[in-house]
């Protein structure tokens, strides 16, 4: 099966998932979006949705089978991941057929934690949970995330 990957990865987390997809699907089968049987659309989460930089690529997905994937700094809840993926999906053009979806937590840059620590001095009740989430996100996507991604991708084939 031929496939194309359209991916935006600000910190490298979503890029790790894209690389796993290449390993699963075989690099020799990757082709242009126009020629692909399946298009994998991946994004880091920007304010709860797709990276706006991907907007120009979306119209070409109108008649394509699409597998959505991404990473986000906040995690721990499939319900949250589903809401983010719903926003990703709502950005697709009419006629795009979503055949699978996957989202996992991704680690954030150290500057984010430093900002949370500073803000926690003023509002610890609000920012301590954010620091705890940051610490839980370290190392993600991890091996378990990559395995879960592979399972979701294979199920969509």
Where do the protein language model's features map onto the residues?
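Generic structural signal for beta-strand residues in well-ordered domains
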Residues: 7, 32-33, 59
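FMN-binding flavodoxin-like domain, especially the glycine-rich phosphate-binding loop
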Residues: 3, 20-28, 46-157
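Short N-terminal binding/cap micro-motifs at the start of the first secondary-structure element
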Residues: 12-16
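Structural motif
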Residues: 37-40, 65
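Short acidic low-complexity segments
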Residues: 26-37
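Conserved strand-to-loop "acid loop" that flanks and positions the catalytic carboxylate
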Residues: 43
């Amino acid at each position: 099966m031929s496939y194309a990957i359209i991916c935006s990865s600000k910190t490298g987390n979503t890029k790790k998932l894209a690389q796993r997809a290449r390993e699963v699907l075989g690099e020799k089968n990757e082709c242009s979006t126009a020629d692909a049987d399946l298009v994998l659309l991946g994004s880091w989460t920007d304010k709860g949705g797709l990276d706006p930089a991907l907007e120009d690529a979306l119209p070409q997905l109108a008649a394509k089978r699409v597998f959505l994937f991404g990473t986000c700094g906040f995690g721990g809840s499939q319900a949250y991941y589903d809401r983010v993926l719903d926003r990703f999906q709502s950005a697709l053009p009419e006629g795009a057929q979503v055949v699978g979806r996957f989202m996992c937590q991704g680690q954030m840059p150290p500057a984010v934690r430093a900002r949370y620590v500073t803000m926690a001095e003023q509002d610890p009740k609000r920012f301590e949970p954010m620091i705890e989430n940051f610490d839980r996100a370290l190392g993600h996507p991890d091996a378990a995330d990559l395995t879960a991604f592979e399972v979701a991708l294979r199920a969509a084939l």
